Design a protein with these regions (language model features):
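Long, contiguous binding/interaction regions
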Residues: 1-51, 55-81
Length: 81
């Protein structure tokens, strides 16, 4: 993979307790959210879960690994793609 590039980070969790804010705060510690594409959120049919796609300006594989590691370790994150 070539860097820098815009890269989508997909995260899923329960639709409560400002999950979106939590995910953004973790990602923004490591990267800049791409302003044009930004954030796309989708709530499940029953409203219990939310999936977020956050497009970031990725500078390196190490940066992506750090983002995935921190998000995956958080108890409120159920799944990542």
């Amino acid at each position: 993979m070539d860097f820098p590039r815009v890269f989508p980070v997909k995260v899923m969790g329960a639709n409560k307790d400002d999950f979106e804010g939590l995910v953004l705060s973790i990602i923004q510690k490591h990267a800049v959210v791409a302003a044009k594409e930004g954030l796309v959120s989708r709530v499940s049919r029953n409203g219990r879960f939310i999936s977020l796609t956050v497009r970031i300006n990725a500078e390196s594989q190490e940066q992506l690994d750090n983002i995935y590691r921190e998000l995956s370790a958080h108890e409120k994150v159920l799944m990542m793609l």
